[in-house]
Regions:
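Core alpha/beta structural scaffold of self-assembling particle/tube/pore-forming proteins
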Residues: 1-70, 79-404
Length: 404
């Protein structure tokens, strides 16, 4: 008979008697919880916020001077004309956020570290607010179409995006669709953000080169979406582009900002040209906003230029910097996860306005003022939040969009 083997008490031996214990630090959030433009970190870009009521918000703009000039009274009188005055007409664009929590979890997860590592009701409310704010950030950079990516190729259920950076628009579990009408709906099961690929349950409708991908729930209203920076400052200017009822093609620079095609130029040369051309039109950009990839290229290219580090570190490690431009001024430089690649916005901060109906992010309340809603059909509680807003650039001529 074999000799007995010594047995030691170790963790596996007494695993049934060990408790699970969590600190009060809660769940660490690895989602995009930083907002460059407005809501979560106004220290970066403190956009003006204007609460309004009624069905629409109106802001007039003069984009052409009056006539009446001549070397004689006769010619001055003959050329007399009124100034060209239009008005932006802004209507609210709605974005809803809803999260459910079962009754048993609501009462089990109370935040007591001896039993649960988070307070379920507080977590769902706080996280819903952050998620909605991040979605607004994404929309403020958009073109109002609801499109979040296009197809480059498909292999099995893996979709390679035309622009790898668009992978930031996707989340595991997200429902996506192929058309404005939402004809085919599928779910995201995996995202490779470095490779720019998205794995889905089925690729029906998103299996051909250049097929558009929309987030379900936004596609049906894609023609009435938030008028974000891509819509306000288009880089393709071959046909009419209407923003807040104004056709920008009447005077592209005055009504859509200066477009600088800096393809082939170094990043520093590109931003310098963009800022200077905006100044030539009477503008005075205060901020440059770009993708983090373009920000990295600019910082590497600007090693020999005068650059300053200011402000607090961003969450992912980059710092806000200021860059010197030829007229001796300084312009802040910011990165955003949702800014389109190879596109830089030279913006005059005081001129951008976030018009919102109600508070910026509203909790939809019950009659008694509570914000948790109960559904006896499913035995769940839910929190419902709403944002009604849009972006207005009052005098686009003060800004520039730069294509790298």
């Amino acid at each position: 008979m074999a000799a007995p083997t010594a047995a030691n008490w170790d963790a596996s031996t007494v695993s049934s008697a060990l408790k699970e214990y969590y600190s009060r630090s809660g769940i660490k959030d690895t989602c995009y919880s930083q907002s460059t433009l407005c809501l979560l970190n106004p220290a970066k870009f403190n956009i003006k916020k204007t609460p309004v009521s009624g069905s629409q918000f109106v802001s007039p703009i003069q984009y052409a001077a009056s006539g009446g000039l001549g070397m004689t009274v006769t010619t001055a009188n003959a050329s007399a004309k009124e100034a060209e005055i239009l008005r932006w007409v802004v209507t609210p664009k709605k974005v809803y956020k809803k999260d459910n929590i079962s009754t048993d979890l609501l009462y089990s997860a109370t935040g007591d570290p001896a039993g649960a590592f988070f307070n379920a009701s507080q977590k769902i409310i706080d996280k819903a607010r952050v998620d909605l704010a991040v979605e607004l950030e994404r929309r403020l950079f958009g073109a109002g179409t609801g499109q979040i990516g296009t197809v480059s190729s498909v292999s099995g259920t893996v979709v390679t995006l035309t622009n790898a950076a668009d992978a930031r628009n996707f989340e595991v579990g997200m429902s996506i669709t192929d058309t404005v009408a939402g004809t085919n709906i599928t779910q995201v099961t995996a995202v490779n953000r470095s490779a720019g690929t998205v794995t889905v349950v089925a690729t029906t409708g998103i299996d051909t080169l250049n097929d558009s991908i929309y987030r379900y729930g936004f596609a049906t209203l894609s023609t009435a979406g938030v008028q974000g920076l891509q819509k306000q400052f288009p880089t393709t200017r071959t046909s009419a582009n209407t923003v807040h009822t104004i056709d920008q093609s009447t005077d592209w620079n005055r009504l859509a900002g200066t477009h600088v095609d800096a393809t082939g130029a170094s990043p520093y040369e590109a931003v310098t040209e963009g800022v200077m051309q905006a100044k030539a039109e009477g503008g005075d950009p205060t901020h440059l906003i770009m993708s983090f990839e373009d920000l990295s290229a600019l910082m590497n290219d600007g090693q020999g230029q005068k650059m300053y580090s200011v402000g607090d570190p961003l969450q992912i490690g980059a710092k806000i910097i200021e860059i010197a431009v030829p007229d001796g001024g300084l312009v802040k430089v910011l990165g955003s996860a949702f800014c389109p690649a190879s596109t830089i916005y030279a913006l005059n901060q005081p001129d951008l306005e976030l018009v919102h109906w109600g508070s910026e992010l509203m909790n939809i309340q019950n009659n008694d003022g509570s914000i948790l809603h109960y559904s006896d059909t499913d035995d769940v509680w839910n929190v419902r939040q709403l944002a009604m807003f849009d972006l207005i650039v009052n005098t686009p001529a003060k800004h520039a969009v730069i294509t790298l």
